[in-house]
A protein has these predicted regions:
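Active-site mouth loops of central-metabolism enzymes
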Residues: 7-21, 76-83, 158-168, 272-281
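Conserved, mostly hydrophobic/aromatic
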Residues: 3, 31, 43, 62, ...
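Acidic (Asp/Glu)-rich catalytic clusters
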Residues: 32, 59-67, 94-101, 144, ...
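Flexible, glycine-rich active-site loops centered on histidine and acidic residues
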Residues: 2-17, 80-144
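N-terminal beta1-alpha1-beta2 module of alpha/beta enzyme domains
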Residues: 1-66, 330-332
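A conserved active-site cap/scaffold subdomain adjacent to cofactor or substrate pockets
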Residues: 172-190
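An alpha-helical appendage that flanks or caps ligand/catalytic pockets
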Residues: 124-151, 195-295, 327
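Hydrophobic faces of well-ordered beta-strands that scaffold small-molecule active sites
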Residues: 3-7, 39-41, 71-73, 101-105, ...
Length: 333
């Protein structure tokens, strides 16, 4: 079983923004040394205490700081971006580090309504649906679009290209990924529904047995009940439920108030705690083993929901696949 890290680059306790970004880099180096397969960074906008706004910038930097680990976006929020330009960016990055670049793509806005309005201000009103934009991006990456002979994202799209992943949390998105033969990352740390995880994993693998199905989970090493309690207290979750059925999850009261102030929509707010896998190394591995035996998961991705730098490091060290042997891959970086 392969293990991966998702780092949302939070502002850490007692750290400046620059120091927190430094920790994002150091954690990538640590994961690289310890045999993790992938290290993903996210895209968020106008979010309190979250730094990562530009995964393409961080991915390029982290590839330069590591040797073996795959580095990727987890993910590019495609509703804010031109699919052709995203394909160009990650094709270029892939030329810098062949075989190590992953492009995860998500549908969520990754930020507040104000940020979404700012990011999409100049986009045409009849913006394509997410599925259309994703298929457009895939066609550029795969060189299968209608104008592929004259419109290219690079002078060379054969020697190296990014591995493409769809990020999602529903049966429909998993089926969409499988139908289009794209790897899939299920955001279990958002959905927190094991029955749904099993249903989605089984459906995806049935439709696309050759695809990678990755379950992204919230995981923290906690040795005592006191540490477990502290982790739970740090991770309150607010679900914003919109009239049209949409649900958005945020982690602070300020974010809740910002959403309410910046929209005319009626919103129902529900407070709960983030569902996490907490415990000792053996307890966490036992739970992961239970999940992998109950549904066809290819890899796990660990989201570390804490602003405590030491706890983040300890969790990554404790769960390290240190017996995995990696051959260093060639590249310019």
């Amino acid at each position: 079983m392969e293990f991966n890290i998702l780092n949302q680059s939070p502002v850490l306790n007692g750290h400046s923004v620059e120091q927190s970004l430094g920790h994002t880099t150091e954690l990538a180096k640590l994961a690289d040394r310890l045999g993790y397969k992938r290290y993903f960074v996210s895209e968020h906008h106008n979010m309190e205490n979250v730094i990562g706004t530009s995964p393409e910038v961080l991915v390029t930097h982290l590839l330069n700081q590591t040797k073996n680990i795959n580095v990727g976006a987890g993910g590019v929020m495609l509703s804010h971006h031109n699919p052709f330009h995203v394909a160009e960016q990650f094709q270029l990055i892939s030329h810098l580090a062949p075989g190590r670049v992953n492009l995860g793509v998500g549908k969520a806005p990754g930020g507040t309504p104000l940020a979404t309005d700012a990011l999409q201000h100049e986009l045409r009103p009849d913006i394509d649906s997410f599925n259309d934009r994703f298929l457009s991006l895939k066609s550029f990456v795969d060189s299968t679009h209608d104008n592929h002979k004259v419109l290219k994202i690079s002078v060379d799209t054969e020697s190296s290209k990014p591995d493409l992943f769809l990020l999602g949390g529903s049966l429909s998105s998993a089926k969409f990924a499988a139908d289009n033969e794209v790897n899939y990352i299920f955001a279990h740390f958002i959905k927190n529904d094991e029955n749904l995880l099993k249903e989605v994993a089984s459906a995806y693998k049935e439709l696309y047995p050759g695809g990678k199905f990755i379950a992204a989970l919230s995981v923290l090493l906690t040795e005592t009940e006191k540490e477990k309690k502290a982790a739970k207290e740090e991770n309150a979750v607010y679900s914003l439920k919109f009239k049209d059925g949409r649900t958005l999850r945020v982690t602070t009261e300020k974010q809740v108030n910002d959403y309410i102030k910046n929209t005319d929509e009626k919103i129902e707010v529900e407070k709960s705690q983030l569902d996490m896998i907490l415990g000792t190394k053996d307890e966490i591995l036992s739970k992961l083993n239970e999940l992998s035996n109950s549904c066809p998961i290819d890899e796990f991705m660990f989201h570390l929901p804490t602003a405590d730098a030491d706890l983040r490091n300890l969790t990554v060290e404790a769960l390290a696949p240190i017996h995995t042997i990696h051959k260093e891959k060639a590249g310019i970086l």
